């Protein structure tokens, strides 16, 4: 019956140029349940939730709350109905404090004067009640990603929202923060709050959700009770075929040393200390070496130094026998280094460029793409079309698609196509599957293993311990800017890695 559901989205259709993002989708949310929304990137999950939150207006369909039809024209309407949303990319003002961000738009006032003490009291009470401890006076720019997510959750609670939407909430969190978030969700459920949980991680769905609705290519595939299903069945519903959840790869056959890092140190001006300290290791042709660790332990700074985004303070980096320590990014690329960056929006793509222009960002100066100083658009499109077909990059208007309009998974596929097609000697893959669904993850893992099998040296940087254990031939753990241990994935455990990642243990001697 209709009164069983706190929210009903009935026959929702939402279109964008060249694509039907939601095609006659129905979703029904019960009071006090955690309802997961699962689907490949581009399946329409975030679009559907954006309709519920008033960011988009549907072409067809209706939304009901407690059985009554409602109009949600904007996020203010959604908040008035008790609907809140934590977006995958947080909507925070970096130069504002935590407190100012939480109360922004709903500041309490009396006779036109801001009642900040009253707001602080309410925020701290919510913080204490739900275990979401924050420093109300800290600037957003100075706090961790995990802490920023707490601020987003407190924004919803401050507005007395009872229907909470989480869009890929664990995509940017460490394993410890993920466990913490799962507990917070369970606490919300006990209080009778209803949660819509967009995720691509099947383990999380099985751990915290009561039911799951699956979308595929904008269409409704069904809703299942979690207690009656399996990860394999959910994967099949999501991608329309059996998905290999384990990486199938033969033992590595390492060859020559391709990357040799010697005593690299990088100083952080922001934190006034060394972010990377005396790091040394090698990566051979035909092997995948993973740099594992909790976020914020020097991995990002090290990759910046390795790829030329920042200068190292001391040490030496050699690529296939050539000293590249002081080379430019372009020269490192010419020497055979490819880079799949951690932040695809910041360092991987120009979002307002077309897909074809993004495909040649690192090659447009080559003779095949220009003549007399002018870009040969026909050759650029021909090359882009080839990569789109070869790597199954899906977009509304093919090579002419503006990259900003593409799903995260397809943006990542475009970067991987561009970087692998350079036939590199060294592939630096940083969080290559962050925020992606199982279908895209399976695809990307296959591509990385195929590169290794071709004889490419692969340096993988990942926070995902399942990915680390499945893909790596060797694992290096980084803690506070140092390599504290080297492991064989066949003889170690996630628990052992966790101790080294947390700084509880350290091997006496680093090995190459």
Protein language model regions, located:
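Glycine-rich phosphate-binding loops of nucleotide-dependent enzymes
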Residues: 2-512
């Amino acid at each position: 019956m209709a009164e069983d559901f706190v929210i009903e989205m009935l026959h929702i259709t939402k279109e964008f140029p060249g694509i039907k993002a939601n095609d006659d989708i129905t979703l029904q949310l019960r009071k006090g349940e955690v309802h997961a929304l699962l689907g490949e990137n581009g399946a329409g999950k975030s679009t559907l939730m954006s309709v519920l939150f008033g960011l988009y207006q549907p072409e067809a369909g209706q939304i009901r709350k407690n059985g009554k039809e409602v109009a949600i024209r904007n996020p203010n309407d959604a908040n008035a109905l008790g609907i809140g949303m934590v977006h995958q990319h947080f909507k925070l003002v970096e130069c504002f404090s935590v407190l100012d961000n939480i109360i922004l738009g709903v500041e309490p006032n009396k006779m036109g004067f801001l009642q900040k003490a009253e707001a602080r009291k309410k925020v701290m009470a919510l913080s204490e009640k739900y275990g979401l401890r924050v420093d109300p006076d800290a600037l957003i720019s100075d706090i961790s990603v995990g802490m920023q997510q707490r601020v987003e959750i407190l924004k919803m609670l401050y507005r007395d929202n009872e229907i909470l939407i989480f869009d890929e909430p664990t995509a940017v969190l460490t394993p410890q923060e993920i466990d913490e978030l799962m507990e917070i969700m369970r606490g919300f459920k006990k209080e009778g709050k209803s949660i819509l949980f967009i995720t691509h991680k099947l383990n999380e769905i099985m751990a915290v959700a009561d039911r799951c609705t699956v979308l595929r290519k904008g269409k409704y595939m069904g809703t299942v009770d979690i207690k009656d299903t399996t990860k394999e069945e959910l994967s099949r519903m999501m991608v329309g075929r059996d998905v290999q959840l384990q990486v199938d790869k033969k033992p590595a056959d390492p060859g020559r040393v391709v990357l040799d890092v010697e005593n690299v140190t990088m100083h952080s001006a922001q934190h006034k200390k060394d972010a990377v300290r005396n790091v040394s290791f090698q990566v051979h042709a035909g092997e995948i070496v993973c740099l594992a660790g909790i976020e914020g332990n020097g991995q990002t700074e090290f990759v910046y130094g390795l790829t030329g985004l920042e200068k190292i303070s001391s040490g030496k980096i050699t690529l296939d026998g050539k000293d590249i320590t002081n080379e430019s990014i372009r020269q490192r690329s010419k020497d055979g280094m490819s880079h799949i960056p951690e932040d695809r929006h910041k360092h991987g793509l120009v979002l307002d460029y077309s897909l074809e222009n993004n495909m040649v960002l690192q090659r447009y100066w080559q003779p095949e793409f220009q003549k007399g100083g002018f870009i040969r658009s026909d050759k650029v499109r021909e090359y882009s079309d080839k990569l789109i077909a070869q790597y199954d990059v899906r977009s509304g208007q093919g090579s002419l698609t503006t990259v900003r309009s593409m799903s995260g998974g397809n943006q990542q596929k475009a970067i991987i196509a561009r970087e692998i097609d350079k036939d590199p000697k060294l592939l630096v893959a940083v969080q290559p599957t962050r925020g992606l669904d199982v279908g895209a993850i399976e695809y990307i893992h296959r591509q990385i293993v195929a590169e290794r099998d071709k004889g490419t040296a692969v340096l993988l940087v990942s926070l995902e311990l399942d990915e680390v254990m499945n893909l790596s031939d060797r694992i290096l753990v980084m803690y506070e800017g140092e390599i504290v241990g080297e492991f064989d994935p066949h003889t170690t455990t996630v628990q052992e890695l966790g101790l080294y990642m947390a700084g509880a243990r350290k091997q006496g001697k680093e090995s190459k």
